[in-house]
Amino acid sequence: MASVRKAFPRRLVGLTSLRAVSTSSMGTLPKQVKIVEVGPRDGLQNEKSIVPTPVKIRLIDMLSEAGLPVIEATSFVSPKWVPQMADHSDVLKGIQKFPGINYPVLTPNMKGFEEAVAAGAKEVSVFGAVSELFTRKNANCSIEESFQRFAGVMQAAQAASISVRGYVSCALGCPYEGKVSPAKVAEVAKKLYSMGCYEISLGDTIGVGTPGLMKDMLTAVMHEVPVTALAVHCHDTYGQALANTLVALQMGVSVVDSSVAGLGGCPYAKGASGNLATEDLVYMLNGLGIHTGVNLQKLLEAGDFICQALNRKTSSKVAQATCKL
């Protein structure tokens, strides 16, 4: 782990004066998009070297300063399975809680939920999947058993007035089972929604999706779950994350998950590379005239910070381009 240096200011030449293009030929697009920043959890969970707790806390604070409305802070999973998240309570207690910003945490079971609530969590997330093999490797149980675990979490969350977000993994393909049926994705999404999840994030966990697959999957899911309750979570393994996200926006989705500097992967999904970079998403949305409330300059600084801490290059094309200006 490299020592953390002060982030260098970037020259946003051509970005600060960026004008929105005409979108009349692109179909209806949302006027505003809620970005769910998953870098501190999904982005860091697969790092081999343990990231110091103060670095995680500072990253989240910088993302808050950038204006991101939702920042997934950590995961209350067993350190045996994900050692990187062993400091979950310290992270959640240590971050600054900015007014108007939500800091959800992943809670796969009742034990995790109880620990999260004790640490001050106000919103939690649960993970489902459309693949039996993936669920076995990721949660050590069947799909049906995973829903039984969620049921207890959902009941406890409702009793405590804590919001629950649901994830559907492998929505566009599975590393073990290959192609995934849109109908199966719709079935799992409907079940999570009917259990009380206020929002369902549809994840292309290994990044194999294309715009056509995204359209077919969303069409099926939207027959079962209101589009206002849907989000997309795209990995960029094959360079399709922005294209897939744009299709989702054109279909009415207005919530997008992304990760600063494109950090991320999945410890149980071989070949999965990083998430859609938040910097690239914000740049595209700015160009489309879609409001996000995110300060791109401060976001780039947060990306610089964590990449220096990890001693790695950013996966964000926008960060790479502005570094050369």
UniProtKB/Swiss-Prot annotation:
Keyword annotations: Acetylation, Disulfide bond, Lipid metabolism, Lyase, Metal-binding, Mitochondrion, Peroxisome, Transit peptide
Q: Which residues form a coiled coil?
A: none
For substrate, which residues are the binding ones? R41
Pyruvate carboxyltransferase domain sequence ranges:
33-300
Q: What coarse category fits the chief subcellular location reported for this protein?
A: mitochondrion
Leader sequence range is: none
Q: Which GO terms describe its biological process?
A: ketone body biosynthetic process; mitochondrion organization
The regions listed as transmembrane in this protein's record are none
N6-succinyllysine PTM positions: K48, K137, K179
Q: Where is the transit peptide?
A: 1-27
The active site is formed by: C266
Q: Give Gene Ontology CC terms.
A: mitochondrial inner membrane; mitochondrial matrix; mitochondrion; peroxisome; protein-containing complex
Give all N6-acetyllysine modified positions: K48, K111, K137, K179, K324
Give the top-level enzyme category.
Answer: lyase
The record lists a divalent metal cation as bound by: D42, H233, H235, N275
Gene3D superfamilies given in the database record = Aldolase class I
Please name the CDD domains in this protein's record: DRE_TIM_HMGL
EC number, UniProt record: 4.1.3.4
- What molecular function terms (GO) are annotated for this protein? hydroxymethylglutaryl-CoA lyase activity; magnesium ion binding; manganese ion binding; metal ion binding; structural molecule activity
Report the pathway entry.
Metabolic intermediate metabolism; (S)-3-hydroxy-3-methylglutaryl-CoA degradation; acetoacetate from (S)-3-hydroxy-3-methylglutaryl-CoA: step 1/1
Which family does this protein fall into?
Belongs to the HMG-CoA lyase family.
Q: Oligomeric state and partners?
A: Homodimer; disulfide-linked. Can also form homotetramers.
Its protein name is Hydroxymethylglutaryl-CoA lyase, mitochondrial
Gene name, per UniProt, is Hmgcl
